[in-house]
């Protein structure tokens, strides 16, 4: 179902339900469409908040995992969110890790689904073929447990992003940042209760 995207204090976000705050951080593609099922379920128990991350709005120097993490911190401060249950998917999981390491005082629990931040598999078995729609469709379908999740609308979105020169450059910047920003040596500093969700096998970089 479509959700109202609010625009306050220069932040765009979805907010549904009541209760303790559950903040969802999306990956590179899909944003709200990837979280519809989660929003619908958790809004019955939590105040579910999904900030729209400025993945393609930041300048190239700040198109990094750290740059997105700073945005998330500003968002939580602006909304005065405390004791947050933070859930991050893929690149959003990496951003969540960086945030909780720098600002643990605001986070009550951490959930990571297919998070980047430990090991990156490059671009899989080949480089992205920007003009090949079928290639992009197949790679997008591989991102999900159920390939049907990759609707034509989502594939069209990914195809459009990949074929936009400026956005493609920022994707590369984010991907390189994720590879450089390995957090393996810092994970023992996280004291919040943490749930890890990971597929048995993956052939994709954990950014989507």
Tell me what each language-model feature is.
Residues 130-192:
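Conserved alpha/beta-hydrolase catalytic His-Asp/Glu region
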Residues 14, 40, 49-87:
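Active-site loop/oxyanion-hole signature of alpha/beta-hydrolase fold enzymes
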Residues 26-28, 84, 88-93:
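Conserved alpha/beta-hydrolase "nucleophile elbow" surrounding the catalytic nucleophile
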Residues 21, 47, 82-85, 106-109, ...:
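Structural signature of beta-strand start/N-cap positions in the alpha/beta core
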Residues 94-138:
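Flexible "cap/lid" loop of the alpha/beta hydrolase fold
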Residues 1-10:
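N-terminal cap/lid segment of alpha/beta-hydrolase-fold proteins
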Residues 38-42, 189-208:
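Conserved loop-alpha-helix segment in the C-terminal half of the alpha/beta-hydrolase fold
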